[in-house]
Amino acid sequence: MPELQPAAGAVANPQQPRIGHWKQKLLAARTQLREELSARKSPRELLRHQAAVVDRLLKEVWAGHAMPRDVTLAAVGGYGRGQLFPYSDVDLLILLAAPAEAELARKIEELLGTLWDIGIEVGHSVRTIDECITLAAADITVQTTLLEARLLAGRRALYSRFVRRVSDELDPADFQQAKLLEQQQRHMRYAESNLEPNIKESAGGLRDLQTVLWIARAAGIGRSWSELSRRGVITAIEAREIQQHEQFLQSLRIRLHYCAGRREDRLLFDFQTPLARAFGLHDRPHRLASEQLMQRYYRSAKAVSHIATIVLQNLDARITPPSDKEYHPLNERFGIRDELLAACDERLFERKPSAILESFLLLQRHPEIKGVSAPTLRALWRARRLISPAFRKDRRNREQFMQLLRSPERVARMLRRLNQYGVLGRYLPVFGRIVGQMQHDLYHVYTVDEHILKVLRNVRRFAVPEL
């Protein structure tokens, strides 16, 4: 069924006398929310509060239009999650028991017209359950949207049938595969937006966090970071870290919306300085406020990417348990399982810190290894704190690092991986200080660490092709 639009030149809306009242309520609520942001309230609370305000208003408008009993109103998308950013669309699903006849179509048009008149920017669809299921089968975006549906008003029995059908038609393994492909394509699409990254869509952004929770929810494993922690998918420390990064990104996006005065997810050059001021940052002798903010963003995005990789691997092991993959030892400390490097035990790096750099040597020397297993990746991330002055002075560690640099192959790739896992900046503190550091001008497209790694890669290409 095509989406219904408020008809141009239609008869006057019977709710016209109440529209001014509803409009004032919405404006007052939005003003209060902006004041709460200035009071440094939790971004999660702000997003939920904004959604709750719109919930109450929608229910009031729905009741005012006396919608038929066999019609249901549901929140979907981000609004369905109970989160609403200042200038985001309010995504709605009007669920029908049967295709709409003329009178019902007219009432829906009036309802949508009222919502637009009071200042709610609505993204909507009007569908039967069968139409929802058909579209979801053909489009992973629609399927994801329906997964987060939340009842607002109308017939509960119809909504319950809809939820059961969506659940029955959902295959967790297929859903996971489709979402991971979608994420890979999205990362490629936004790979060149280094100077002005997209808080929502770029790698390490909010969409990556949502992808993890979508997959977990589809598999019935959990709907929140605390729930995933209780289920053993992530550790309590990882849950706390990822919530901290999520709240920072949410706070940044909220302020960006207010700064732009519209729905905007790109950290455009012109907004970076006022955003930094909104976070209480000030210029220093050698670092602008905007550069401080962007470094925090880049480091947060890197951490999100790393932890999300661990969680996605753990979810994959539960959704599609691998057949009994053999462990092929490389030495006493490491082996290969399912094409991934695996440590003999998760406490290896604590017992033998030199194994940290050894793991990268093995990745460099064995191109058949496609990555690092989740337990080893987690242990490696935790072991960064062991890279101390004594670690750097240790002869074995110095030799291993030089072996990485002297290798005829995959040097640039390993340096990038060392940086990605937070090891390079720990081993070379001078490099650590410039991780995520950008220069606030239109000439320097990459952060300083990324620029250095690209230069090293290009210099090597003059003599040795990276295989």
Question: Can you name each region flagged by the protein language model?
Answer:
Residues 1-467:
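A nucleotide- and high-energy phosphate-metabolite-utilizing enzyme signature
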